[in-house]
């Protein structure tokens, strides 16, 4: 018997939703509420492939959910709100408390709130969505799916920082990692495409979008990942610096007179591709600029690819080899150029990739880009975090 599951991603003033029929993983509709709590909020829903947009004031997330449910009935997507069988909520930080997704109870809600100090921008916003759905749909299971949960299998040697140990014990300072739902989805899909048990595979997953992280997945479990205590760590990103020498922060403060908060803002929002190029955080813009001879744009692309390339080598060493390299997310799925730069020179590791196949895979296409004889397979997989969320609602919401 099919179930209708809502996959939800709530921001402080936004609410993204997808209604998915399970277990078929068929998208029924999707949409977005923007500018919640502001004047002229925008509600967009997809009906028969067309976007239907309305502008009205929406005061809070409860009203946003109410409007969404009304739209479902108005457009005959559902007959009654009781047709919805469960909801799944993306929650950015689950800390060490949540090594897997969890059915939401009052206790779980309280624990998500307590973890807000680890994700002050995201967890409170995710909670707004959870509370709105629990209020309006009280009789169905609601499940929290944590970005950090997949990486809770990392061993101590991967997640501990070389700081006084009591900082970890007292304040929870350690590597947590993010994009877990995406890494989990593409690693499972890669195993399906290879027709091999995931337990037998060593996978390096490259989630490369405006935010980017690399994960080492051994036997289906994350054993290391590039992001850290926050999503600022790791590789160069659209506007984030990735790893830097921590002593740079007081040095920049001294040289510029900026506060620690201001420097952190620069590292999060003015660095990465944007900071290096001085023009854009968008890879497409930088590729065009590089082609027209802008040296700084080319340099930004080279730095970006080089950091990812380095992590692949590092994680191959961590797993004593690699069987599959996966590219996913906006840049990973679409940038022929970045994939080529990242893979360049990896033949010593058994990576032999086909430039023609690489050229053909973009705009949501899935497939292998390695030569048949390549010991290491290279695959492009469009990520689908919403389907992963819906799967977890079925499992943890007791709907299977």
From Swiss-Prot:
Organism placement in taxonomy: Bacteria, Bacillati, Bacillota, Bacilli, Bacillales
Alphabetically ordered keywords of this record: ATP-binding, Cytoplasm, Kinase, Magnesium, Metal-binding, Nucleotide-binding, Transferase
NCBIfam families, sorted: ackA
Protein name: Acetate kinase
Species this chain originates from: Staphylococcus aureus (strain MRSA252)
Protein role: Catalyzes the formation of acetyl phosphate from acetate and ATP. Can also catalyze the reverse reaction.
Cofactor: Mg(2+); Mn(2+)
Chemical reaction(s) catalysed: acetate + ATP = acetyl phosphate + ADP
Cofactor note: Mg(2+). Can also accept Mn(2+).
Site residues (Transition state stabilizer), renumbered to this chain: 179, 240
Family matches, as InterPro entries: Ac/propionate_kinase, Aliphatic_acid_kin_short-chain, Aliphatic_acid_kinase_CS, ATPase_NBD
GO biological process: acetate metabolic process; acetyl-CoA biosynthetic process
């Amino acid at each position: 018997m099919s179930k209708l599951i809502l996959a939800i991603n709530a921001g402080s003033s936004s609410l993204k939703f997808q209604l998915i029929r399970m277990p078929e993983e068929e998208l029924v509709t999707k949409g977005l509420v923007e500018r919640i709590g502001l004047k002229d909020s925008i509600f967009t829903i997809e009906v028969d492939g067309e976007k239907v947009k309305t502008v009205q004031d929406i005061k809070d997330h409860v009203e946003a959910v109410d409007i969404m449910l009304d739209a479902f009935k108005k457009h005959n997507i559902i007959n009654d709100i009781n047709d919805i069988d469960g909801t799944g909520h993306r929650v950015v930080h689950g800390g060490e408390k949540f090594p897997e997704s969890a059915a939401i109870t009052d206790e779980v809600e309280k624990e998500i709130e307590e973890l807000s100090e680890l994700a002050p921008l995201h967890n409170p916003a995710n909670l707004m969505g959870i509370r709105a759905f629990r209020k309006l749909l009280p009789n169905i299971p609601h499940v929290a799916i944590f970005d950090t949960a997949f990486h809770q299998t990392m061993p101590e040697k991967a997640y501990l920082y070389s700081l006084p140990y009591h900082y970890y014990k007292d304040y929870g300072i350690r590597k947590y990692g993010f994009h877990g739902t995406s890494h989990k989805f593409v690693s499972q899909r890669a195993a399906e495409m290879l027709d091999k048990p995931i337990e037998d595979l060593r996978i390096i997953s490259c989630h490369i979008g405006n935010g980017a992280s690399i994960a080492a997945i051994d036997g289906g479990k994350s054993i290391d990942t590039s992001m850290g205590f926050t999503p600022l760590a790791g590789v160069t990103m659209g506007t984030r610096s990735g790893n830097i020498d921590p002593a740079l922060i007081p040095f920049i403060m001294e040289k510029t007179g900026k506060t620690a908060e201001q420097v952190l803002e620069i590292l999060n929002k003015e660095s990465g591709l944007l900071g290096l190029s001085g023009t854009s955080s968008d890879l497409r813009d930088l590729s065009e600029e590089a082609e027209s001879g802008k040296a700084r744009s080319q340099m930004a692309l080279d730095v970006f690819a080089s950091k990812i390339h380095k992590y692949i080598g590092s994680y191959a060493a961590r797993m004593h080899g690699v069987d599959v390299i996966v590219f996913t997310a906006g840049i990973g799925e679409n940038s022929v150029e970045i994939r080529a730069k990242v893979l360049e020179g990896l033949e010593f590791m058994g990576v032999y990739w086909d430039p023609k196949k690489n050229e053909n895979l973009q705009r949501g296409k899935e497939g292998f880009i390695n030569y048949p004889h390549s010991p290491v397979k290279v695959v492009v997989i469009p990520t689908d975090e919403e389907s992963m969320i819906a799967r977890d609602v079925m499992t943890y919401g007791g709907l299977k």
